[in-house]
Structure formats: C-alpha cells, structure tokens
Amino acid sequence: MKQYLDLCHRILNEGKWVKNKRTDKLCLTVINADLTYDVAKGEFPLITTRKSFWKAAIAELLGYIRGYDNAADFRQLGTKSWDANANQNADWLANPYRKGVDDMGLVYGAIGRKFPKADHGSLDLLKQIVDDLSNGIDNRGEIYTFYHPGAFHMGCLRPCLYSHHFSLLDGTLYLNSTQRSADVPLGLNWNMVQCYTFLALMAQITNHKAGQVFHKIVNAHIYEDQLALMRDVQLKREPFATPTLTINPAIKSLEDLEIWVTLDDFKVENYFYHPSIQYPFSI
C-alpha cells in the first residue's frame, strides 16, 4: 500500500503533463516505477484509502486465464470492466474485425491462450508454462504475454499489463510482470491485485511455494480529470492495515481455473477501507 501511495505522490511532485492522443486528455506522467508484492508473506496489495472492488479485479484475471474475448463472459464472471471498450469505443465500433455486441477481439487472454504462430496455427502459452512448472522446468522463458503488434488492429484495446514472466528458483515461484501504461487511480488498483493473485494461483496449481511479484510499470500517469480527487481526497487519508487473501485449496489445476472456479473461491479478510471515490474512466 505504501508503495502505491509513494508512486501517487511521486507523480504529483515530479510528473510532466503529456497529451494522450487516444483519449484527448492531459496526463501527469512519470517514467518507470517498480513495485514488489510479497506473496510468501501474504502481503496482499489491496488499496485501503478508498474502497477497492477486488472481486471484479480477480474476475477479470480469471477471464484472461480462460482466454475470453467477449464482455458478456466477463460479466458472467463478475466484472463489467470490458463493457465500455467493447461497446463504446468509436474506433472499435467501426472496425471490420468486430463481431458484434460485447466482442472485444484479440486482446489479453484471447491472444495468450491462442498466440498466433508465424507459420500458421497457434500456441497456448499458459498451458505450456503450467506444464513446464508442474514438472519442475524453468526454461528462462516461461512468459505469458498478450503483446502482439501484428494483431492490435483486431482488438478493441492494446494490452497495458502485457507480460507475466514466471521463474522457478529452488522450489519457489516468482513473477515479473511488465506494464507499458498504468492509469494509477483506476487501473493500477486492480493490476496490483491481479499480479499478486496470479502468482498465488500459479504456485498453487504447479505445487510450488510462492515468492515475490516484481511489477514494472513503464508509463505511470494520472489523468487531468482525476488529479483533484487523488490530491485532495485520497492522499489526505490514512491507510489501514494490509488485508489478507485466501484461495480455495481445492484449486489444483489449470483445468479447475478454466471450468469451475468462481469468485466464491477467493476470500479477503480484515479489509478496512475509506469510502469509495468515483474516478473518471477514459475510453
């Protein structure tokens, strides 16, 4: 939590204004931020200076794990996070690759679970990683990536948190996650939860101890219409103690995550928080 608040203060104190072409808004921006989440110690990085909807963040992660490409599937899991980009993005609505209402196209897990090969066909990157790690193999390239520039035109949004690199060392599983762009008041709140939960899940289904997540953010920003709420409201609040996340121990495999796991299999305890803040969302 302190890391997150420190980053917010850094943006306010050191950030430079940049005009974002896609949203036509100014962003107060810094380059490079490194956050660490200690899964081994149970330090769940959930924001307490405002209410965070952690269930929706985990629902979105489950959708990425399953390779979903439709906002309706995400809603069924428990999040409406893709409704706007699938159905209100003017460029995507006019895109010939859009299949209809709620279609997201080739984004996130839809790329990672069927990564297009140059010689045709596709690779299931996540299954390869799970198979390797389950057999104690780390080939130094256990990377679940959603980043495919050749397919950007076939999806409603380029991936922001685009790469998850798993490493196995002496029986402990680590994760390096890379994010090209972070809407710090809104998106990063969820991304921190997702990185932590992803490592915890992968360690559990591959039968390893969980170590740390190292989360690199390249472009961290606060939109101009979010700035006052961050500066004058959220950063004036004192954080509460860190809550804890518990995952159903019956989850044993990738197939479990694909077939039957729901939000009921995740519990957060001792979560105390300040009132929610309605930050503007930029499509």
From Swiss-Prot:
Keywords: Cytoplasm, Methyltransferase, Nucleotide biosynthesis, Transferase. It comes from the Bacteria. Its EC number is 2.1.1.45. The gene is thyA. Belongs to the thymidylate synthase family. Bacterial-type ThyA subfamily. HAMAP family: Thymidy_synth_bact. It catalyses: dUMP + (6R)-5,10-methylene-5,6,7,8-tetrahydrofolate = 7,8-dihydrofolate + dTMP. Pathway: Pyrimidine metabolism; dTTP biosynthesis. NCBIfam families: PRK01827.1-4, thym_sym. DUMP binds at residues 22, 180-183, 191, 221-223. Catalyzes the reductive methylation of 2'-deoxyuridine-5'-monophosphate (dUMP) to 2'-deoxythymidine-5'-monophosphate (dTMP) while utilizing 5,10-methylenetetrahydrofolate (mTHF) as the methyl donor and reductant in the reaction, yielding dihydrofolate (DHF) as a by-product. This enzymatic reaction provides an intracellular de novo source of dTMP, an essential precursor for DNA biosynthesis. The active site is at 160 (nucleophile). (6R)-5,10-methylene-5,6,7,8-tetrahydrofolate binds at residues 183, 282. GO terms for biological process: dTMP biosynthetic process; dTTP biosynthetic process; methylation. GO terms for molecular function: thymidylate synthase activity. It is found in: Cytoplasm. Homodimer. Gene3D superfamilies: Thymidylate synthase/dCMP hydroxymethylase domain. InterPro entries: Thymidate_synth/dCMP_Mease (IPR045097), Thymidate_synth/dCMP_Mease_dom (IPR023451), Thymidate_synth/dCMP_Mease_sf (IPR036926), Thymidylate_synthase (IPR000398), Thymidylate_synthase_AS (IPR020940). This is Thymidylate synthase. PROSITE patterns: THYMIDYLATE_SYNTHASE. One of its GO terms (cellular component) is cytosol. PANTHER family: THYMIDYLATE SYNTHASE, THYMIDYLATE SYNTHASE 1.
